[in-house]
């Protein structure tokens, strides 16, 4: 199959997802539609609507854009079917219902910013740095019912220096991931796409580290930990969302301080 014969629908929202979409467009792949989050209210009183980075890029390339509030909405599903996708690609979007990920004849694959099955979840880059890992990477895998558990198609590895913060690792994985997305599509075009169950990558589920969503309280520094753990914790949250601690003034007032 030739590049232009494969109809691709792309799904993503933040900056991390722009690089992969850009690689597909500039590589001459046939992106027939882009799905992203609805514009969100910003500014005073939410009077201004801000488009996602993916939407901004898609519009600049004259790509059709859909922004569903609900992924099971029949009107959206009808529009999605009308795009007649052969393949869907997901990068930093949201959990998809089966009616969506099972729609194309070649299925839907996701780019995840870890070496799956390690760090399944919403914040894999942060947790790899917080835990002091010396290596991470990116994985493409097929979507299935359980989040981040589908068969692995391909992986790339990235070393983490002990001076790297999460921003540095994020940007490196963003670039590496874009290359992996196009490589994965090429495997499909060449008829060489073999996917391996994640169970073949570990013996004991206890070996797996999760990557849950990070909340404000998660970012509070525990000064009772060893210095190395505190150092890794801070760089794993820098520059965003930022580790923090509390300063108590002589008068008893408290102030939160971000630590980078």
Where are these regions (language model features)?
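N-terminal Rossmann-like dinucleotide-binding module
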Residues: 1-45
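Surface-exposed, charge/polar-rich loops and edge strands
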Residues: 4-5, 168, 218
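Internal alpha/beta domain cores that form substrate/cofactor-binding pockets in large enzymes
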Residues: 9, 32-35, 64-83, 88, ...
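Structural motif corresponding to alpha-helix initiation and N-cap regions
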Residues: 18, 51, 73-77, 94, ...
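Donor/substrate-binding cores of folate-linked one-carbon enzymes
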Residues: 27, 87-210
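N-terminal beta-loop-helix "entrance" segment that forms/cooperates
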Residues: 40-59
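Internal anion-binding site segments
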Residues: 203-260
